[in-house]
């Protein structure tokens, strides 16, 4: 703020209104109290560890304990000093404010000057008041200068106090890690790369959880910042499986959403409230379009169920601006047929060849579906990558070829997946067999990395748990090509683990390239016994390419025992099917 150009009416008023210096003085008292408590804690902590190591507990272990405890006692002392410094600077700011207010012209004096000036101007007959007007204006200019000088002094004092403050983070960064295999400082856990993480296998800072890539996440397996939950890609999500690689989501509350600021699950788009909507600002379930309130609507700004068009109010209308039931056309009011589409069996369907209620898509079996060939309730179905739109089996899916509930991606088998070709729950990545994975080609849970077999891995091609490095077999490794626990360096390679014949493998008895897990014969696989020739698969006993699950022989499938192409679910031998036994 450039207070030099502000008149004394504003500068004086601002200095004499508000809370004054009382809050800053209260803050100084609080900082003084904190400094005293921290100082007492530092003294007690140091005394206890010293007495323990010199009396009741002696030997190398006691010496190691004392050495590990010393930095924490030092941090408590440093924090006490910083708190005392903050108290002193708060008092300095309060003093600067009081001095500035004492030097500031009182608002009543400024108002009196302006009132006198106005009176003299209004009564200035024949210029007789000119000398008095000049004197009053001169006094006003002096008030202006006095206020500006007071504000300059206040700004200088407050700035000097702020410059004296030392961030607490500097002291925290000097703390050692409590755990093994960490690269960084002040981590409470193992296998972290970064600072101030509480958990294992994180890449980033201040995460509370495991297997995160990013900062300040509360949960596990997230890629991004400030997420609460698991397996999210993006920032500030509350839930699991939101966003996906290349399409991060932010501010979602729920699971498996693709987009931003959705409240619910399985939505594709922004600011939807409900389940399985495709579009923006929808309230309800299975709507395809924007601004719809209800279920199974295709179009925009519809209120009701199963409408196909724009601005309809009611059930099963086809057209625009209709109010009623089963109407076909535009701007009609009343009741038409039970269905406004063709070849439908049921009530209030506006699509074609539907069986059920309130469907606005085509070939659906169920209630409130707005895309094609869905079986279930409230599916909207958007085209995801190479996969056809719709063809979901379940509830509240906005993606394509999903089997389950609340999936916004494609070819998922499970619940709340925002990614594609996953088997499990809350995955925002791709080709995962497990749950809450934000990475890709993982077999396990809460992995934000790629190609891991195990849990809580933020690294790549690890077999085990909580690894933030590359191609490790074991746990809590931040390095690469290590076999064991807590390693931060690089092993000899070309593999880690035991009995591997290929290169860049971790785990046991793999013969391919770039795999993790057990007895994989293909390349870039994770899991167990994926066959020779299988490429980019996750799970168990797969023989197909880019498949996820158990014993799939087809291509781009998720689930169990699928032999076709683009299938989710189980026991499917045809192509582009969701569900079971197709």
From Swiss-Prot:
Residues 258-278 have a biased composition (Low complexity). The keyword Signal applies. One of its GO terms (biological process) is response to host immune response. This is Uncharacterized PPE family protein PPE62. Keywords: Signal. Residues 241-278 are annotated as: Disordered. It holds the Pfam family Pentapeptide_2. It comes from the Bacteria. The lineage of its organism: Bacteria, Bacillati, Actinomycetota, Actinomycetes, Mycobacteriales.
């Amino acid at each position: 703020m450039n207070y030099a150009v502000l008149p004394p009416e504003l500068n004086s008023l601002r200095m004499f209104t508000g809370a004054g210096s009382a809050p800053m003085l209260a803050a100084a008292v609080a900082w003084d109290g904190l400094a005293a408590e921290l100082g007492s804690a530092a003294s007690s902590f140091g005394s206890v560890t010293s007495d323990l190591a010199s009396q009741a507990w002696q030997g190398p272990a006691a010496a190691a304990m004392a050495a590990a405890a010393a930095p924490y006692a030092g941090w408590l002392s440093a924090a006490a000093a910083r708190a005392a410094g903050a108290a002193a600077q708060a008092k300095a700011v309060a003093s600067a404010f009081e001095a500035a207010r004492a030097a500031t012209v009182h608002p009543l004096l400024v108002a009196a000057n302006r009132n006198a000036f106005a009176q003299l101007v209004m009564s200035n007959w024949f210029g007789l008041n000119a000398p008095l007007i000049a004197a009053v204006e001169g006094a006003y200019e002096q008030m202006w200068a006095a206020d500006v000088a007071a504000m300059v002094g206040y700004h200088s004092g407050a700035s000097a106090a702020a410059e004296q403050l030392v961030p607490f983070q500097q002291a925290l960064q000097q703390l050692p890690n409590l755990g093994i295999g960490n690269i960084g400082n002040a981590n409470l856990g193992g296998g972290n790369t970064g600072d101030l993480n509480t958990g294992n296998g994180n890449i980033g800072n201040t995460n509370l959880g495991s297997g995160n890539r990013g900062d300040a996440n509360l949960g596990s397996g997230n890629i991004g910042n400030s997420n609460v939950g698991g397996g999210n890609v993006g920032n500030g999500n509350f839930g699991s499986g939101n966003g996906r690689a290349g399409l991060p989501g932010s501010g979602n509350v729920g699971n498996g959403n693709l987009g931003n600021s959705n409240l619910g699950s399985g939505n594709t788009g922004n600011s939807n409230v409900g389940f399985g909507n495709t579009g923006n600002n929808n309230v309800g379930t299975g709507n395809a379009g924007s601004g719809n309130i209800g279920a199974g609507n295709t179009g925009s700004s519809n209120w009701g169920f199963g409408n196909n068009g724009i601005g309809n109010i009611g059930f099963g209308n086809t057209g625009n601006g209709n109010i009623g039931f089963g109407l076909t056309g535009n701007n009609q009011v009343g009741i038409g047929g039970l269905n406004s589409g063709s070849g439908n069996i049921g009530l209030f369907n506006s699509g074609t060849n539907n069986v059920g209620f309130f469907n606005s898509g085509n070939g659906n079996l169920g209630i409130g579906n707005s895309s094609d060939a869905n079986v279930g309730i409230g599916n909207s179905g958007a085209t995801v990558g190479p996969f056809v739109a719709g063809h979901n089996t379940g509830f509240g899916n906005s993606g394509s070829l999903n089997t389950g509930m609340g999936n916004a991606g494609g070819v998922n088998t499970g619940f709340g997946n925002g990614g594609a070709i996953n088997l499990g729950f809350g995955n925002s990545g791709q080709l995962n067999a497990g749950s809450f994975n934000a990475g890709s080609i993982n077999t396990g849970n809460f992995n934000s990395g790629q190609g891991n077999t195990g849990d809580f891995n933020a690294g790549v091609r690890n077999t085990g748990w909580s690894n933030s490095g590359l191609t490790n077999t074991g746990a809590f490794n931040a390095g690469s090509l290590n076999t064991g626990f807590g390693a931060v360096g690089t092993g000899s390679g070309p593999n880690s683990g035991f009995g591997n014949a290929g290169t860049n493998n971790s785990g046991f008895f793999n013969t391919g390239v770039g795999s993790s897990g057990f007895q994989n014969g293909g390349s870039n696989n994770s899991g167990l016994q994926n066959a020779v020739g299988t490429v980019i698969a996750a799970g168990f006993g797969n023989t197909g390419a880019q498949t996820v699950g158990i014993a799939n022989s087809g291509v781009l499938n998720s689930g169990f025992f699928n032999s076709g192409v683009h299938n989710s679910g189980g026991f499917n031998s045809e192509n582009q099917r969701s569900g079971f036994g197709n």
